[in-house]
């Protein structure tokens, strides 16, 4: 038996001194950290110890003895249960400060770069109702088809109709589709024995166009009575221009399967970023917060500082949103993306906007960029927008060897950003400025844009 200062089921009084990067309150008992959900710095709480481990433990709030001035009423207790909005109890201004501090902390701790300016996080005027996409699981509860979200760390569905961080038109559409499925006794998916059929309802909506896409994700290709379901959806939701069925027969947590069937209308919806049109398919990666995407891309344009003469490489280009945004001010843009379907979308989006100075190639940036250089291309600006795992080590080496004048790094993970900045700094680059942008209010996710330039000897 380990001799910790607290043990499971102890009821103790603590004071919260900090927040973790996941938004949990931190208290210490004889230097032993306890992490507590729904707790804010400065609060005095009575808690119950839930679990103890070698380095830290977890607790649960029983009573708030002294509340933080930054605490605000929560929108919905179910939000806490499912973990969708772990910061909903923290005033929005304090959320922004928390995110700025997280970036500063990781830059100092991981990159050992205290002097890099981290600007205040750019927030939203209304930090709710921002998501343009919903992926809602479907299950049977009390013998009825239900939509909602899974309880944290479980596959128990909690029925929900209002998600608050999603476009309210999407919330309303989900409820209407749910009711249509109930009307026709569609069988919801049963994960335990891999029976039933309807697994998820996915809805995408163009922020500027209002166009809506409905994706019905099923276990089998047969969805009865589809001849009645489709007209009912169109009648209930006039904004729908695309209805798609996606078939996923596997026992997996992955939402989409490989087979997609068009049931009505177009395979894509259209939305705009600045004055550019983009076509979005069921599986396209497209930024989920359209308002903040424009804020973030404006910062990318500022850091790229294009004059019309530059060669730009857009690594991890997706469907071309960043590259095509920059093409208007560049000599030539080369987009690189590992997913072939996204490359085709990027090419189509270039045609849609009559942009002729952008080309897109399928492959790994760490393999294709050296080939471009071998063929005589010298990029002036490289934009990288990697997944959470950050840059591939080989790509970091390639960037250092290629020596573009500027690197603009769009990050969704401060820890891997700091790691990569440290490596690029060793390779002769200097991080000039980091601008966090709050694309995900009420959550702990942090996006940022960083400018790196060649260091001056």
From Swiss-Prot:
Listed CDD domains: AdoMet_MTases (cd02440)
Record: residues binding S-adenosyl-L-methionine: 287, 316, 337, 385
The keyword Methyltransferase appears for this protein: yes
Metal-binding recorded as keyword: no
Active site positions, chain numbering: 412 (nucleophile)
Coiled-coil stretches noted in the UniProt entry, renumbered to this chain: none
Gene3D superfamilies for the chain: 2.40.50.1070, Nucleic acid-binding proteins, Vaccinia Virus protein VP39
Residue ranges of every copy of the TRAM domain listed in the record: 5-63
SUPFAM superfamilies: Nucleic acid-binding proteins (SSF50249), S-adenosyl-L-methionine-dependent methyltransferases (SSF53335)
UniProt keyword terms in alphabetical order: Methyltransferase, S-adenosyl-L-methionine, Transferase
EC number: 2.1.1.-
Pfam families in alphabetical order: TRAM, tRNA_U5-meth_tr
PROSITE patterns with a match to the protein in the record: SAM_MT_RNA_M5U, TRAM, TRMA_1, TRMA_2
GO biological process per UniProt: rRNA base methylation
A GO term, aspect molecular function: rRNA (uridine-C5-)-methyltransferase activity
Family: Belongs to the class I-like SAM-binding methyltransferase superfamily. RNA M5U methyltransferase family.
Protein's recorded name: Uncharacterized RNA methyltransferase EF_0728
Source organism of the structure: Enterococcus faecalis (strain ATCC 700802 / V583)
